[in-house]
């Protein structure tokens, strides 16, 4: 192309798949097109903006009639913008009949006997017959010899398999924790990307592989409760920590005609930092995780709970939260500040470890114990008057207190003529150079305006010399200095 030629302008008529700007452009156009129908189709517009995930629409309704009405409006809005929404799937036969077989999504094989009843929803699978979410863990692109345990995988292959398990709500938290701790151990060993794992990591890897077959059997109801919108609802967040991990998990507590019911919302597990930390600090980090989980749940739901309860089995953490956080060290103080910005003091309660479901997200899974991670603690299904959780004595509030430093400066002798601190420095150091360096370091610590450096420079030493000279003059000419400061005359013979 000749630089002197006139520039030619090209305009794209459609969004190009794969361009860096494509996701943002697609979302903007989708929302902008929907907003033009805000007055005529308010429910449909709200669904398009809030319930669209790229090109997938995931929504739920309280009745079949409202579902058909809103979806028809959504289809109409997209059609006027040049988009075609199709491949619907629902647990309602009436809904599927209205939209016809040609618009219903093709079945995805999950189980040989019930393959036609399973549909993929954002990485998970929905069984339309039982209205439950499940998992199908397929690793078709990964060498089969890894799963047959005939070959030890490399670090890269382990990471690839672990990241293939998509669990956005933490349903498989007890299983994913094994994988997270395995990856942490591999990193600590400094294993190369293409080097086979070794030692105890092999045993833990095989244990995790075998547990995946149990994970595929997990099912969780899509709907929290049929009467969730008609009765008062409560949000309960539990948090816990151990030496190896910390976790948070949330549940709805719903009152129905048959009594109280708890429904799993989501959970989160994280490995403890490789740098050693105390259990109270990890428990505090779990409380921060629970606070962030609370915010995520409230922002992601249209339901406004009647009350929110935060539960921890650490009496020390509860004591920190309910005391003045400014007296604690920065690590504790900053995290308590984040907790109190999003929660109230009265929201926090103590729960025994045996009744804390978050405990199951902090320890390696054991096939012999019954888990309450998905169903919640038993006491949530009882009336609050029957809760017998024991007493929560105040924990140790002396931990993590800021150290109190007392700096004694400018202490004078009884006659006021000698600075005691300076005199001790003169008597302690016989080397002038060493004395100057000590004075420079002390002055830097006292003056917070000075930018902290890891070394002394010439300016610091010169300032130290002036300080020493002033103090020597103050000792040798104390009376004259006092007279000048008070405006008195000095005798000529002095």
Model-derived features with residue positions:
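Active-site palm subdomain of RNA-directed nucleic acid polymerases
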Residues: 23-69, 73, 292-310
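Flexible, low-complexity interdomain linkers flanking nucleic-acid-processing modules
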Residues: 99-163, 340-356, 360-494
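Catalytic palm subdomain of template-directed nucleic-acid polymerases
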Residues: 46-81, 93-102, 316-329
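Acidic, metal-ligating active-site segments
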Residues: 233, 237-263
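A short, polar/acidic, helix/strand-boundary loop motif
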Residues: 6-29, 158, 254-285, 323
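C-terminal reverse transcriptase regions that engage the nucleic-acid substrate
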Residues: 11, 48, 78, 114-229, ...
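Reverse-transcriptase-like RNA-dependent polymerase core
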Residues: 1-10, 25-39, 127-144, 150-152, ...
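RNase H catalytic domain
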Residues: 51, 92, 289-353, 357, ...
């Amino acid at each position: 192309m000749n630089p002197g030629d006139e520039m030619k302008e090209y305009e794209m008529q459609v969004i190009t798949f794969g361009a860096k700007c494509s996701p943002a452009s697609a979302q903007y156009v989708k929302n902008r097109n929907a907003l033009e129908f805000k007055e005529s189709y308010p429910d449909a517009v709200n669904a398009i903006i809030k319930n669209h995930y790229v090109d997938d629409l995931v929504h739920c309704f309280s009745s079949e009639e409202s579902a058909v009405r809103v979806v028809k409006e959504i289809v109409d809005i997209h059609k006027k913008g040049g988009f075609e929404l199709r491949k619907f799937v629902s647990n309602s036969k009436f809904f599927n009949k209205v939209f016809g077989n040609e618009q219903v999504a093709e079945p995805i094989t999950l189980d040989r006997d019930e393959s036609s009843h399973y549909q993929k929803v954002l990485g998970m699978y929905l069984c339309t017959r039982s209205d439950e979410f499940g998992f199908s863990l397929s690793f078709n692109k990964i060498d089969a010899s890894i799963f047959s345990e005939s070959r030890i995988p490399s670090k890269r292959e382990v990471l690839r398999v672990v990241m293939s398990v998509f669990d956005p709500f933490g349903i498989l938290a007890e299983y994913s924790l094994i994988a997270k701790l395995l990856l942490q151990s591999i990193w600590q060993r400094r294993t190369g990307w293409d080097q086979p794992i070794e030692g105890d990591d092999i045993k833990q890897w095989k244990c995790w592989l075998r547990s995946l077959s149990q994970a595929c059997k997990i099912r969780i109801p899509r709907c929290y409760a049929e009467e969730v919108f008609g009765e008062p609802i409560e949000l309960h967040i539990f948090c816990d920590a151990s030496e190896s991990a910390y976790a948070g998990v949330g549940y709805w507590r719903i009152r129905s005609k048959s009594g109280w019911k708890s429904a799993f919302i989501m959970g989160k597990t994280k490995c403890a930092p490789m740098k050693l930390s105390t259990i109270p600090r990890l428990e505090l980090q779990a409380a921060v995780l629970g606070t962030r989980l609370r915010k995520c749940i409230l922002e992601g739901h249209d339901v406004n709970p009647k009350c929110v309860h935060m539960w921890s089995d650490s009496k020390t953490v509860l004591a920190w939260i309910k005391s003045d956080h400014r007296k604690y060290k920065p690590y504790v103080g900053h995290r308590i500040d984040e907790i109190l910005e999003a929660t109230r003091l009265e929201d926090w309660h103590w729960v025994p470890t045996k009744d804390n479901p978050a405990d199951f997200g902090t320890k390696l899974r054991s096939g012999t114990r019954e888990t309450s991670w998905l169903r919640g603690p038993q006491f949530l299904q009882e009336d609050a008057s029957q809760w017998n959780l024991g007493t929560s004595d105040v924990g140790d509030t002396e931990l993590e207190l800021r150290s109190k430093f007392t700096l004694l400066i400018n202490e004078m002798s009884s006659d006021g003529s000698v600075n005691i601190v300076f005199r001790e420095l003169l008597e302690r150091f016989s080397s002038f150079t060493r004395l100057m360096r000590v004075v420079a370091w002390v002055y830097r610590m006292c003056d917070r305006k000075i930018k902290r450096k890891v070394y002394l420079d010439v300016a610091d030493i010169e300032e130290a010399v002036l300080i020493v000279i002033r103090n020597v003059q103050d000792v040798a000419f104390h009376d004259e200095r006092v007279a000048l400061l008070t405006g008195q005359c000095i005798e000529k013979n002095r």
